[in-house]
């Protein structure tokens, strides 16, 4: 196998000038410090082997010239040449030159194209695109971290199967689309064939159906003309009769108008009174709410002063104690100041006396000059003789002074300890007083808390009783409301019904005489058995409110809106348009008019009842109701006793489950009693709600009790702490100080005994010294006339000592008194601060109590005023209520007069109503006939007007129409009256039928003929009338689809062949590479690991087309169990990645392998294994050129190429070579 012999570089990256690098051995290591240009050498090898510029860490080719990145290129060209030695010994030189901004390729100094250059390298086994000759820095770690899909991409790159990926995807899409088109055209062809067969059958059925349909249309026209002809004849007859009757009614109506005018005036007066009464009621409610709102405020204002007074008393007592303590301490301080003045005065007197004595004695003890000299000479001689004694005495004096200082210190400590004991006694006294105050406050708080608890229990009991009673009342009210209202009305509905009843009473009071009440309250079925049927017919009108006029209705609606009430239905008597009752219906057997089984009062609400009931009939059973509704030539609205309702339109509605509950409302006596019970319960509920409102007061009391409880808790805690901690601590400290004080006396006595003992010894020494002095001063003493020299000296020295001692006593007294005075001053200042604090607290509490009392009085005044105003309003309400009752009695008399007049008019109107009802029914019948013709598309022959003039509105029963619907019906009937029908096509035999029996017989015959023809049509399912056109269209589409299917089938076959060819080529490329790598990887991994137990596996996730999914790579490290790749250690992962790298290289291997720092992630153990493996492989399989920084690795190489930097404008790389074959390896066997 050939190998890379030399590399020649000129001005490439960090290599300035021309440099020859090599020769390269079978295993060469490139070493050098970081930044020296090692990787640039690898870039040079990559460059000469045709690598892209983007992979050489630069943007353009010019940047590869030395110095170009810093703007100082060393030349305008650069090149790299590679000398390759083949097995035969022949050498080939490959060069790549940078000229300007492009590359120039040469083989043996001959310029060639890139393709030829690449082909020559491929013949040597160097694949530029696959880069099978080099491994960049960090590639090992990258391979170790790859997931299965990324490994697949790596194999696609190595095997060059990825070059076919785009063509593969393109041809696969073309194949799938072609197959889908083929399938689509096949199903389309199949469906159109079925359509063609179906279209033939439809054409035959359509022709037969049209013939029958024409015959039915002609028969229907005859039937409708027959009905309309006789309907118009009857309408003309009834119009003449109605005109005669109406003239007789006008006269009687004038009398009624006069009585109604009188009633209207009285209504206005009553309305004014009712509004005044309602205004007073509103004010009473407002005042009651205001009182309930202000009562808790008054209770709170009443409670606040009592708590503040307790606090004030406690503060006042604390002030008195503080003042008492301040006065006592002030007296103690005054005593100390007096004592200080007394000591100062005694000191001054002593100083004056000493001055006088000094002057008198000074004259007596004056010596002559020669005597003084003699005294000093003799004194010096005496000192020399008694020197030993003097030294001993001096020692005693020093010891005596030290003990005296100790004595003074102990006595000072004793005085300080006594002062501290006094301070602790005062603190004990203060703590004792604090305990007394806390105990007093706790007792008071407990008493207050007990009172609050009692009040809370009382209020809680009242509120709970009120709540229980409210629940009981609500439960009873619910039962009452369920009986009064619908069975569907739930617990919330009862309050809604109550609200509606209140509004009803209000509008009755506001508009007396104009608002009659709800329809259900003004009428009653004649027998109980009719209750369900009447309830069903009245329906939603059952709760409608009847008023005298439209204006009253609108005023009531406005009032309900203002009161935020629920929507209500109003029936104004002057606005309703009612169809006359059809008198013929009273003659039907087995049925009665619903209006005939209802009693109503007052009489003038009949119009509203006619509007609600219409011409509805009530029957004993469902069969009769159905027969009468649909059995005759004319339909009727009927209802059975069980509530089953049959509409004219054909709609049937059964008796709902709640109908019986609604029907119970007719029980008048039960309703009255229930209403009375409801009113009584409502009043009681109001009273209990007042008691329940005390919840606010209860919460206030609970809050105050909680606050008191917390303060009591803190006070008890403070008391406990004061007793167990502060008091005990003070007692302990006092005991400790007393113990210390007791120890002072023995110590002081011991020191005094030592001092006294030493005094005796010092006296003895002094006497000895005196004897020596007496011997020396004997003659001198006789001369000056003293017994001994000490008399002379004591006169002067003793006096000075006594004076100094006395002065020291004075100073000690002043110091002691000053310390005590300063302490007392500080304590006095603290006591004065306490007095001021408590004085401020007392003053503040006093002011707050005054404010709270004023606030309590203000709230009490407001409550009294509010209660007085409330009582005054109640008195006004009683007076106004009495006036309203009187006015109501007067109006009742007028209503009776009006009722009598109305009965007379009603009697006269019955005949007119009967005629109007018949006439209206005939008009409705004509409208229904015309409408039926229009809806059924029956073309009537018309001499005036068109079919478009016929209204689409359905003629309904009176009970179902609203006022606006009645107006629209009249307009429709008037418009349709202008339509003239041409009866020339109607046979004369049908026109001549006059008697009812003849008309019924002819009509029955026409109906039977039509029914027979329609029966035949119904048995024939409606055909497609455009069947012929459909058949022609389907034939054309079938031929077109057949052609498209054949073309799509050919395209699919061609696309599949092309795809299979690309798929096979891609699979062959990929599989050849994969099988090679999979076969070699286990052996390579064992060799790298130096252990035959190591195992490595490669497996595709998709064996059929492995390049579409991932490739799994797993290794079993030596001496370990199988684990996923992610769970291997860092070193194990790196070795596994190298095994994969070398296995990939084994597929179409290049003659040399350049590796950049593959040992970076290896530990010392694995470095040796990898280095030995590369050394083995380099002997037989490939030449290895490795960049390395680790000694353990590059020492295994046959030669070293050292790269070192020199500094210039930019780094300049220099190269050294070193042949290691001359130096035997310490461990030459790579298997060890």
Swiss-Prot record:
Question: Where is it chiefly localized?
Answer: nucleus
Question: Mind listing the GO biological process terms from this record?
Answer: cell division; DNA repair; meiotic cell cycle; response to DNA damage checkpoint signaling; response to radiation; sister chromatid cohesion
- Identify the residues that the record assigns to the SMC hinge domain, covering every copy: 515-629
**CC terms in the record's Gene Ontology section:** kinetochore; meiotic cohesin complex; nucleus
Q: What is known of its domains?
A: The flexible SMC hinge domain, which separates the large intramolecular coiled coil regions, allows the heterotypic interaction with the corresponding domain of SMC3, forming a V-shaped heterodimer. The two heads of the heterodimer are then connected by different ends of the cleavable RAD21 protein, forming a ring structure.
Question: Its biological function?
Answer: Involved in chromosome cohesion during cell cycle and in DNA repair. Central component of cohesin complex. The cohesin complex is required for the cohesion of sister chromatids after DNA replication. The cohesin complex apparently forms a large proteinaceous ring within which sister chromatids can be trapped. At anaphase, the complex is cleaved and dissociates from chromatin, allowing sister chromatids to segregate.
Q: What is this protein called?
A: Structural maintenance of chromosomes protein 1A
Origin organism is Xenopus laevis
């Amino acid at each position: 196998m050939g190998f890379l012999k030399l590399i020649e570089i000129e001005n490439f990256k960090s290599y300035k000038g021309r440099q020859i690098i090599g020769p390269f051995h079978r295993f060469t290591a490139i070493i050098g410090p970081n930044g020296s240009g090692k990787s640039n050498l690898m870039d040079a090898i990559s460059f000469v082997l045709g690598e892209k510029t983007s992979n050489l860490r630069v943007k353009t080719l010019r940047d590869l010239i030395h110095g170009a990145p810093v703007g100082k290129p060393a030349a305008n060209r650069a090149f790299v040449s590679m000398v390759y030695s083949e097995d035969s010994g022949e050498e080939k030189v490959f060069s790549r030159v940078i000229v300007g901004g492009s590359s120039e390729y040469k083989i043996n100094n001959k310029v060639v194209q890139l393709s030829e250059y690449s082909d020559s390298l491929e013949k040597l086994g160097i694949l530029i695109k696959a880069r099978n000759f080099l491994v960049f820095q960090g590639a090992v770690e990258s391979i170790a971290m790859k997931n299965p899909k990324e490994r697949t991409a790596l194999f696609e790159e190595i095997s060059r199967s990825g070059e076919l990926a785009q063509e593969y995807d393109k041809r696969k899409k073309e194949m799938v689309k072609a197959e889908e088109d083929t399938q689509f055209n096949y199903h389309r062809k199949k469906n159109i064939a079925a359509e063609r067969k179906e279209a033939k059958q439809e054409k035959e059925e359509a022709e037969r159906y049209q013939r029958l349909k024409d015959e039915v249309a002609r028969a229907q026209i005859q039937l409708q003309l027959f009905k309309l002809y006789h309907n118009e004849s009857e309408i003309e007859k009834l119009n003449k009769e109605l005109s005669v009757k109406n003239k007789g009614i006008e006269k009687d109506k004038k009398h009624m108008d006069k009585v109604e005018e009188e009633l209207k005036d009285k209504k206005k007066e009553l309305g004014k009174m009712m509004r005044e009464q309602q205004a007073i009621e509103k004010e009473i409610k407002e005042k009651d709410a205001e009182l309930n709102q202000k009562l808790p405020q008054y209770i709170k204002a009443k409670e606040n002063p009592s708590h503040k007074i307790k606090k004030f008393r406690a503060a006042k007592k604390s002030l008195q104690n503080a003042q008492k303590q301040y006065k006592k301490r002030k007296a103690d301080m005054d005593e100390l100041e007096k004592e200080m003045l007394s000591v100062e005065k005694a000191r001054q007197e002593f100083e004056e006396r000493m001055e006088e004595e000094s002057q008198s004695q000074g004259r007596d003890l004056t010596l002559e000059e020669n005597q003084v000299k003699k005294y000093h000479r003799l004194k010096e001689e005496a000192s020399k003789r008694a020197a030993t004694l003097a030294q001993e005495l001096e020692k005693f004096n020093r010891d005596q002074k030290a003990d005296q200082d100790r004595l003074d210190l102990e006595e000072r400590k004793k005085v300080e300890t006594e002062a501290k004991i006094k301070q602790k006694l005062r603190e004990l006294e203060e703590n004792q007083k604090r305990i007394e105050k806390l105990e007093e406050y706790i007792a008071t708080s407990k008493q207050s808390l007990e009172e609050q608890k009692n009040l809370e229990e009382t209020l809680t009991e009242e509120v709970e009783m009120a709540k229980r009673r409210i629940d009981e009342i609500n439960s009873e009210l619910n039962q009452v409301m369920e009986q009064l209202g619908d069975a569907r009305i739930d617990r919330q509905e009862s309050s809604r019904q109550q609200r509606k009843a209140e509004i009803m009473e209000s509008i009755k009071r506001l508009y007396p005489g104009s608002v009659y009440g709800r329809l259900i309250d003004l009428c009653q079925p004649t027998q109980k058995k009719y209750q369900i049927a009447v309830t069903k017919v009245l329906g939603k009108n059952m709760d409608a409110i009847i008023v005298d006029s439209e204006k009253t209705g609108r005023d009531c609606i406005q009032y309900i809106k203002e009161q935020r009430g629920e929507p209500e239905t109003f029936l104004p008597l002057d606005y309703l348009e009612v169809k006359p009752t059809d008198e013929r219906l009273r003659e039907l057997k087995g049925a009665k008019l619903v209006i005939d089984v209802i009693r109503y009062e007052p009489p003038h609400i009949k119009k509203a009842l006619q509007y609600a009931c219409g011409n509805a009939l009530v029957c004993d059973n469902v069969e009769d109701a159905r027969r009468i509704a649909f059995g005759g030539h004319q339909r009727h609205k009927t209802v059975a006793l069980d509530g089953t309702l049959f509409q004219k339109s054909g709609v049937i509605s059964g008796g709902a489950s709640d109908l019986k509950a609604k029907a119970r409302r007719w029980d008048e006596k039960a309703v009255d009693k229930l209403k009375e019970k409801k009113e009584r319960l409502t009043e009681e509920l109001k009273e209990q709600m007042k008691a329940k409102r005390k919840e606010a007061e209860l919460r206030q009391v609970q809050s105050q009790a909680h606050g008191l409880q917390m303060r009591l808790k803190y006070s008890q805690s403070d008391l406990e702490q004061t007793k167990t901690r502060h008091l005990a601590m003070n007692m302990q400290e006092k005991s400790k100080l007393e113990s210390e004080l007791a120890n002072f006396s023995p110590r002081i006595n011991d020191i005094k005994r030592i001092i006294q003992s030493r005094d005796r010894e010092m006296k003895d020494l002094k006497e000895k010294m005196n004897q020596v002095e007496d011997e020396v001063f004997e003659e001198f003493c006789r001369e000056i006339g003293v017994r001994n020299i000490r008399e002379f000296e004591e006169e002067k020295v003793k006096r000075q000592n006594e004076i100094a001692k006395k002065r020291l006593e004075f100073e000690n007294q002043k110091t002691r008194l000053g310390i005590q005075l300063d302490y007392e001053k500080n304590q006095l200042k603290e006591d004065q601060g306490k007095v001021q604090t408590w004085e401020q607290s007392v003053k503040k509490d006093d002011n707050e109590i005054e404010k709270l009392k004023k606030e309590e009085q203000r709230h009490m005044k407001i409550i009294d005023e509010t209660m007085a105003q409330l009582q005054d309003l109640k008195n006004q309400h009683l007076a106004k209520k009495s006036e309203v009752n009187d006015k109501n009695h007067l109006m009742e008399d007028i209503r009776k007069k009006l009722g009598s007049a109305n009965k007379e008019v009603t009697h006269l109107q019955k005949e007119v109503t009967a005629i109007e009802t018949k006439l209206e029914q005939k008009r409705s019948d004509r409208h229904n006939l015309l409408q039926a013709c229009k809806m059924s598309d029956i073309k009537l022959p018309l001499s005036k007007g068109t079919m478009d003039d016929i209204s689409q509105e359905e003629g309904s029963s009176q009970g179902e129409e609203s006022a606006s619907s009645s107006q629209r019906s009249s307009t429709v009937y008037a418009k349709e009256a202008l339509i003239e029908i041409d009866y020339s096509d109607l046979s004369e035999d049908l026109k001549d039928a006059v008697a009812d029996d003849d008309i019924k017989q002819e009509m029955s015959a026409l109906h039977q003929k039509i029914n027979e023809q329609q029966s035949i049509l119904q048995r024939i399912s409606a055909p497609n009338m455009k069947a012929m056109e459909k058949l022609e269209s389907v034939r054309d589409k079938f031929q077109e689809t057949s052609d498209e299917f054949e073309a799509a089938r050919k395209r699919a076959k061609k696309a599949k062949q092309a795809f299979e060819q690309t798929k096979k080529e891609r699979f062959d490329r990929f599989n050849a590479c994969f099988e090679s790598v999979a076969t070699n990887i286990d052996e390579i991994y064992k060799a790298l690991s130096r252990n035959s137990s190591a195992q490595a596996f490669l497996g595709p996730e998709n064996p059929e087309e492995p390049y579409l999914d991932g490739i799994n790579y797993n290794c079993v490290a030596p001496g370990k169990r199988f684990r996923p790749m992610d769970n291997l250690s860092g070193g194990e992962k790196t070795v596994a990645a190298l095994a994969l790298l070398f296995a990939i290289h084994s597929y179409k291997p290049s003659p040399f392998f350049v590796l950049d720092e593959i040992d970076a992630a290896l530990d010392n153990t694995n470095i040796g294994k990898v280095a030995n493996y590369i050394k083995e492989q380099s002997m037989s399989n490939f030449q290895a050129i490795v960049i390395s920084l680790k000694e353990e690795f590059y020492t295994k190489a046959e030669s070293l190429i050292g790269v070192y930097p020199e500094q210039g404008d930019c780094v300049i790389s220099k190269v050294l070579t070193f042949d290691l074959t001359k130096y035997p390896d310490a461990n030459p066997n790579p298997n060890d």
